């Protein structure tokens, strides 16, 4: 299926969406990469990632793209959920055959409430959605895909949760999706050099911090690692393919959780 992965347009002053672990309003402009959308996008050949806020794509411009795709995957956040629902409805009005999936923290915590918010949402995927979205785009029925919640016979069907992804090396490099679909010069964070690239070297965090979004709503508490070789190779590729790049940032929940692994990677 032709698939659009969307970090939707947001209201002015909102620093959130597909890449932010702390969705909030802000006083200065900053943008994180939509990294969670880019992993499954790398698994689907006929896909595109649209990160609307940093690329200054309006709601109307976004909605107009609906006719070009068969599947919309929208990463939503709690502050932006109501606006995201309206955007999905606009796109469904333009292309009634468009299948719409919502992913992100709100749908993990309250999947039924999310589906009740709009009939434009066909299904939601809880927590890690990389392979669930790939499988649907490749033709699997919703009833066969773990972690999916959808409407069926006037009720909601909750499929069993998928196990966490253990083999992180099997996932695509998000840097290649950045190169394909995003302008890396548009991303900035005040405490990082500009321009920068960020990606993950691990998923999950054993800590129980209440202020951090991802372990509770997306990646879980089991700490899983990419191999050092895979990380180093992606770093090399990134440096070769993004002229002028000044920093690579590892946005892990707990990068230095294991001392020996940190030393191995840094050496």
State where each predicted segment sits.
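Short glycine-rich His-centered loop
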Residues: 1-31
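Short beta-strand segments
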Residues: 4-7, 51, 73-78, 102-103, ...
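Short, glycine/serine-rich, charged loops/turns that create anion-binding
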Residues: 10, 54, 107, 204, ...
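Short aromatic-enriched loop/helix-cap "lid" or pocket-rim segments at secondary-structure transitions
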Residues: 14-19, 114, 161-162, 171, ...
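Conserved alpha-helical elements of sugar-nucleotide-dependent glycosyltransferases
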Residues: 29-39, 230
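Glycine-rich beta-alpha loop elements in corrinoid/cobalamin-binding modules
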Residues: 36, 40-167
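N-terminal [4Fe-4S]-dependent radical SAM core
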Residues: 142-145, 151-198
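Radical SAM [4Fe-4S] cluster-binding motif and immediate context
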Residues: 174-267
């Amino acid at each position: 299926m032709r698939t659009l992965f969307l970090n939707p347009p947001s209201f002015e002053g909102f620093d959130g969406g597909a890449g932010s672990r702390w969705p909030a309003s802000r006083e200065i402009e900053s943008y994180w990469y939509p990294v969670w959308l880019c992993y499954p996008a790398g698994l689907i050949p006929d896909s595109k990632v649209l990160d609307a806020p940093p690329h200054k794509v309006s709601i109307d411009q976004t909605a107009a793209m609906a006719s070009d795709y068969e599947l919309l995957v929208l990463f939503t956040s709690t502050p932006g959920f109501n606006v995201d629902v309206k955007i999905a409805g606009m796109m469904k009005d333009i292309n009634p055959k468009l299948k719409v999936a919502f992913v992100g923290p709100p749908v993990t915590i309250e999947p039924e409430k999310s589906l009740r918010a709009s009939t434009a949402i066909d299904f939601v995927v809880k927590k890690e959605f990389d392979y669930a979205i790939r499988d649907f785009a490749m033709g699997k029925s919703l009833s066969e895909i773990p972690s999916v919640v959808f409407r069926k016979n006037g009720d909601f069907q909750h499929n069993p949760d998928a196990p966490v992804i253990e083999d992180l090396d099997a996932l695509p490099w998000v840097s290649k999706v950045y190169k394909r679909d995003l302008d890396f010069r548009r991303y900035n964070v005040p405490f990082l050099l500009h321009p920068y690239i960020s990606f993950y070297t691990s998923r999950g965090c054993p800590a129980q911090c209440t202020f951090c979004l991802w372990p509770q709503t997306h990646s879980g508490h089991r700490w899983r690692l990419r191999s050092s070789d895979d990380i180093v190779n992606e770093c090399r590729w990134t440096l070769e393919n993004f002229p002028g790049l000044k920093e690579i940032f590892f946005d892990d929940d707990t990068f230095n959780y294991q001392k020996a692994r940190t030393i191995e990677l840094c050496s």
